[in-house]
Amino acid sequence: METIRFALATALAAALTLAGCTAAGSSSTAATSGTTKASAGKPAFPPGLAHVTAYSINTDNPVLTSVVSGAISDYGPAEAVSPGSTGVSAHGSELELKLTHGTFRLNIAGIDTKFSAGTSHEPIYLRTCSTYVSVSDAVPIVPGSGTGAYQGIADTFAMTLTLNEVHNSPCTTSLSILRQVVVLSGAGKITKR
């Protein structure tokens, strides 16, 4: 159960990286409205503030749902993968966002390490047999990982990874969960190199 949850958290962390901020803990800035023309049927990729959310509900599967808004408007699955690998991995240190206009990867190793430490003593609330863990870290885009409309995408995002769940009774994490929500979210300025 912890291995699966770790993979899910890792996948979420990567997805949130796309939403990047310039520094963890920095204040949010309202995105300005703007229009950039797309060329040859491909979406425009202007530099600017992007918001990323990746989430999973009631599953520890390392495949999440992601939505990106702001400088990028796209959506698709986000999969935990190992560096250089193309297959889903329960222990992947990268999160590959497979969006409708291209893909890119987030390095979620740092936020995943913090998340694993935060969940190491589950359930956090023994009396109610529930857990709430929230950690934040900088999540960089893996250099050279962009494809399609995201070829050349770069920068680092401030992300938060949150787990909120209720465990079965008797209270143990080795049993299945009753309800679980895992959310990786953040914002940041993206650039193209």
Task: Label every PLM stretch briefly.
Residues 18-20:
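C-terminal motif of bacterial Sec signal peptides marking the signal peptidase cleavage site
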Residues 34-193:
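Beta-strand-enriched cores of mature, soluble protein domains
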Residues 1-8:
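Bacterial N-terminal signal peptides that target proteins for export
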